[in-house]
Amino acid sequence: MSGSQTLVVKLGTSVLTGGSRRLNRAHIVELVRQCAQQHAKGHRIVIVTFGAIAAGREHLGYPELPATIASKQLLAAVGQSRLIQLWEQLFSIYGIHIGQMLLTRADLEDRERFLNARDTMNALLDNRIVPVINENDAVATAEIKVGDNDNLSALAAILASADKLLLLTDQAGLYTADPRNNPEAELIREVHGIDDVLRGMAGDSVSGLGTGGMATKLQAADVACRAGIDVVIAAGSQVGVIADVIDGTPVGTRFHSLETPLENRKRWIFGAPPAGEITVDDGAVFAIMERGSSLLPKGIRSVKGDFSRGEVIRIRNLNGRDLAHGVSRYNSDALRMLAGHHSQQISEILGYEYGPVAVHRDDMIVS
């Protein structure tokens, strides 16, 4: 593909360590070399790196990964500076400056903070600086749980208005079955839409060092593809993998983006981590899915979590299936009071009103 491209490369702990308990510096050196090669050709490279906990564990000599959040945050605090120092040293060999962006998912929940992060990303890229994005594991808690690494990578790709997102992992891509247990498993080369059948094929990482599995990579691919970003899942050990993705050479599993991507605001809605969730009845499901309607309080059965007006929430049916993400017009306490009631009763129940709908269709993305 001709012309400059923006590529986000996500490097999980299993890739950075090679499955061991220590950072695999030789492997990291090779990945930096590949990134520098593409940077020299005029492409814009963004690194999303994890492994702060692994780096801290190596430095302090912890034989086992601790179970408590506080202990993991201790390791992250020690390892974060060592990890970014390593990236800086390696990129400086090629005369490339890096800029660290420490994020938590909370930084992306708020629309204004999201835009500020996007402006910072663009400023770095415009000045030929490679953004190196880390989770702020030393202060965050949700980020240490399974799945956030891959989903944060998709959000980083949205921030960068990337052309492609490369998720490097310890497998060659998405298989029809777990290749570790099934010798007949086949690599899926092309994906044009993520459905339940595809999700059923996803297995989990067994490295014990990272927090992401193949299922969460599918979630990240879904978010990025809806935003108009192609996604490739490939092995971090694949020779020349970064050049292959830039050039369009078949490698790993490629997820094709939507031909009509979401507009910028809806990219944020779909990508933002939900602050809570609501369960709706079958009537509301029909109205949302078949009629393209807004969600009214009458259709709400239950509310989970504590969230404010204007935050993104998840909408689910009675079976727990995700239907949509949307911006709530009311806070969680208000929606609990309004659940099952007609819109005409809102003022009577609350003493105020922000309109007749709980989530407006214009502020909703159907899954």
Curated annotation (Swiss-Prot):
It comes from Yersinia pestis bv. Antiqua (strain Antiqua). This is Glutamate 5-kinase. Its EC number is 2.7.2.11. Belongs to the glutamate 5-kinase family. ATP binds at residues 10, 169-170, 211-217. SUPFAM superfamilies: Carbamate kinase-like (SSF53633), PUA domain-like (SSF88697). Catalyzes the transfer of a phosphate group to glutamate to form L-glutamate 5-phosphate. Pathway: Amino-acid biosynthesis; L-proline biosynthesis; L-glutamate 5-semialdehyde from L-glutamate: step 1/2. One of its GO terms (cellular component) is cytosol. Substrate binds at residues 137, 149. GO terms for molecular function: ATP binding; glutamate 5-kinase activity; RNA binding. It catalyses: L-glutamate + ATP = L-glutamyl 5-phosphate + ADP. It is found in: Cytoplasm. PROSITE patterns: GLUTAMATE_5_KINASE, PUA. Keywords: Amino-acid biosynthesis, ATP-binding, Cytoplasm, Kinase, Nucleotide-binding, Proline biosynthesis, Transferase. It is an enzyme of class 2 (transferase). HAMAP family: ProB. InterPro entries: AceGlu_kinase-like_sf (IPR036393), Asp/Glu/Uridylate_kinase (IPR001048), G5K_ProB (IPR041739), Glu/AcGlu_kinase (IPR001057), Glu_5kinase (IPR011529), Glu_5kinase/COase_Synthase (IPR005715), Glutamate_5-kinase_CS (IPR019797), PUA (IPR002478). Residues 275-353 form the PUA domain. GO terms for biological process: L-proline biosynthetic process. The lineage of its organism: Bacteria, Pseudomonadati, Pseudomonadota, Gammaproteobacteria, Enterobacterales.
